[in-house]
Amino acid sequence: MGKTILVAGAGHGGLAAAADLARKGYNVTLLEQKAEDALGYDWTDIFAPDALIAAGVPYPSKSLYTYKDNMTFFPPAKSVALTQRVPDNEREIKMERSDIYAHLIAHAKRCGVKFRFETEVTAPLLLGSRVCGVYAGEEKLYADLVIDACGLDSPLRTALPDVCGVEREVGENNVAYVYRAFYARTGDYTPKHNYEVYLLHGGRKEVAWVATEPDFADVLIVRFEPFGTEEADKVVAELRATDPHIGDTVVRGGQFAKIPVRQPLSMLVADGYAAIGDSAFMTVPLIGSGIANALKASHILSETVVADKACAFTAETLWRYQTGYYKLLGTGYAAMTCLKNACLTMEPAEVDFLFERGILTEKEVTITANTTNLQSMMKLSMKEFVERAKKLCTDKILLTKIVRIASQIASATALCAMQPKVWAPQSVRKWAASYNAFYARQQK
């Protein structure tokens, strides 16, 4: 086999993996359907900066980023405000999406990656069960390894045959549909909290935030089913009741996006194929942040590719990427998905109860892109645990739900621990089937 690698899509993890592999002597070409200057949404994004170091990417200029403000969370009744207390050494940085892409692309070019922009990848090119390249329209492009960084609706992952063993569909309640816009500020009202997050906003399966900047209000709306501009406008009108500084004029954004919020793929690899980033569902399930995870995964993938001295790039030789990712991040997010699924079944009154009785505190809402497992969220002393358990026992129905969630989290963790450490086709397929079935049951 050779050392020709195609990266499909300019996802953050794909860009970082391409750069690292090109720097190590591989012939890497990245294909992206958009023009170079059209990448990214017209808004900012946040991520953990240490992920850049993990991926071998230099820090951006200090002029390109600021540090994210702590979020303040409100239950449906807005009766309690819980503000994050993120330690200074764990604060995330905020950058323009376009600047993030420009930084990663410039780095990849310096490392020797070749780019073909405005080239749409439409399907995998197969030789039996092996991915041997991609179709770009009618054009066939061959490679020894294809890295899928095409995102949530990847035309590669969704077209792989069953024999590859890779899930094609995202699954019900596993997509966050997002509307985001920056509205010009109006009036002289200044909110008490700069970054407000409303849970089950309006009593719906909806999260909304209002992040106040000097000249605009950054509004984001998240639902778990598609919605349009008319619905978004109604929600913004509701938000003005508590945040009257949200003006009528959209100065930036006004766009919709889709984000996977679920457990990682059960199979990240197949012969000649590896998925990364949103293509592999690598976001933090509770908040949808995925840039840092994709960057960290890129390093694991690069190390795995380099370790394959024969450049066979089979599912067997790529399996180290899968086990490495699950060890570092995947197991924690698989367990966290159980909590996300349970949150979607919560009633507004139950969320109010958790806030108002002090069962949820500032500790638990201090979730960042560095929150890789539930243990890092639940830093309770035994005394705190007992006190909160007593409060929870006053609501028997909610207590039953919490016990069920705890059982599911334990099962997910145990299931991930059973993932085969060494490639064995039958064992791997059996494990993947059990993993997929476990989460399918939670959707019923």
Predicted regions and their residues:
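Beta1/beta-strand and adjacent pyrophosphate-binding region of the FAD-binding site
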Residues: M1-G11
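Glycine-rich FAD pyrophosphate-binding loop
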Residues: A8-A10, A22-Y41
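Short beta-strand to alpha-helix junction loop
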Residues: V86-A106, F224-E231
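N-terminal Rossmann-fold NAD(P) dinucleotide-binding loop
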Residues: G14-L15
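Predominantly flavin-linked oxidoreductase catalytic cores and closely associated redox partners
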Residues: H107-H245, F281
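C-terminal helical "tail/cap" subdomain of flavin- and related membrane-associated enzymes
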Residues: V306-K444
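N-terminal FAD cofactor-binding segment of flavoenzymes
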Residues: D37-F74
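FAD/FMN-dependent oxidoreductases across multiple families
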Residues: V121, F227-V305, A310-T323, K327-L328, ...
